[in-house]
Amino acid sequence: MNQKKLSLFGFFALTASMVLTVYEYPTFATSKLHLVFFLLLGGLLWFLPVALCAAEMATVEGWKNGGIFSWVSQTLGERFGFAAIFFQWFQITVGFVTMIYFILGALSYVLNFQALNTDPLIKFIGLLIIFWGLTFSQLGGTQRTAKLVKAGFVVGIVIPSVILFGLAAAYFIGGNPIEIPINSHAFVPDFSQVSTLVVFVSFILAYMGVEASASHINELENPKRNYPLAMILLVILAISLDAIGGFSVAAVIPQKELSLSAGVIQTFQTLILHFNHHLGWLVKVIALMIAFGVMGEVSSWVVGPSRGMFAAAQRGLLPKFLRKTNTHEVPVPLVMIQGIIVTLWGAVLTFGGGGNNLSFLVAISLTVVIYLVGYLLFFIVYFVLIYKKQNLKRTYNVPGKIIGKTIIAGIGFLLSIFALFISFVPPASIAKNETHTYQMILLISFVVTAILPFIIYELHDKKGHDTIEEPTHFKAGDVNPAIYPAARGEHHIIKKEEHILKH
């Protein structure tokens, strides 16, 4: 019996959650009207190449189950395959910190307790309470919280976004003052000022993770037509919504007053009180809704990305104890190690950056540079596929034959290199006395992270550690569409009786 194929809309819905990146709107706002240029650049010249190349690799015979781990292992060898899945997982450990900073920014307004967002010690304690509370809530299995994640996405992400867009539209139509200049010169950044370009990395972050959905092209009806169409629709929607969201923040909050972790709440406060001074309570309600929504998103990240590392453990690439799960199919040892790493990142970023905008910017840049190393491997693998493994059968091809494939992948590869290097330039939005701190935290953290998977691979004795299960990729029906694609993970947790933790 043939499995029912995904329609264009069904496939689009699997990835649509990535178009609402509310917590990035304040960072987008720091680029003022340049945000439109950066969104177009990232969407057309980075997101689409990643999406198209991933789709072709996902349909190669023998590559359909393993995701990026399988793709890289099949071409560059197991060592680099492990590194790719490691980077895909490790970037999330930094991403947790960024997300929780955003939650703390919202809660600081609700509780009227600004120290929660500005004092490094209090902020770090708040981060630990939220992160570990959400981590332990996931040990009972992700099925228990799946409905909560969906509710959080609707209540805390979709509804506030609609309200924000509506308020901003009313504000602009009313002819009210706007905090940023609007003219023909304001759209294109000054490329001679490198410090104004570094914010581009946050726009790349908004597009990351689409490769996790590419595997579902094997379930899509008429993929040659529908897959590119779905990706084009997705990028148009992402550019439109992110442009509106970022502009809404930039237009009403002066740049010098903008908090990257609480900027969305600042915007709601300004807009709501502009229309009615008696609705301060409504701002707190919306802030609480947003905190709830992002908490739901963070909770969905706890288990998802560790699935790839669990697949590596089941291939014998990690110590045996990392194959352990509890009865709810949660890889507890991996999740606990992940928690320790997040705690360390939280300490480094919060105390190293002083708990202010610097901490948030370093966290975003570090997330991006870690993920970009994985994407560089991704594009290298694609070049190997189209030049050295042309004989491998596949059901989808990037348009343009070998020349078109080379140009499309080449653009994505070069833009990845550009974003990687530009990340280390201190942004124009931070004070001059903070530039050295920004570079040192980012550079040291990046170097340690870049060599870590290769050290782990070399030190772990892989003799006698046979593969107990090959990775099994998610089908479309296994995916919770409310979860951001980069945080879902791509593989099932294959539970073995002998590897279940005993109480």
Curated annotation (Swiss-Prot):
GO MF, one example: antiporter activity
Entry-linked Gene3D superfamilies: Amino acid/polyamine transporter I
InterPro entries: AA/rel_permease1, APC_superfamily, Glu_antiport
Residues spanning the signal sequence: none
Main location: membrane
Ranges that cross the membrane: 35-55, 153-173, 194-214, 232-252, 366-386, 407-427, 440-460
Keywords: Amino-acid transport, Antiport, Cell membrane, Membrane, Transmembrane, Transmembrane helix, Transport
Family: Belongs to the amino acid-polyamine-organocation (APC) superfamily. Glutamate:GABA antiporter (GGA) (TC 2.A.3.7) family.
Function: Involved in glutaminase-dependent acid resistance. Exchanges extracellular glutamate (Glu) for intracellular gamma-aminobutyric acid (GABA) under acidic conditions.
Protein name according to UniProt: Glutamate/gamma-aminobutyrate antiporter
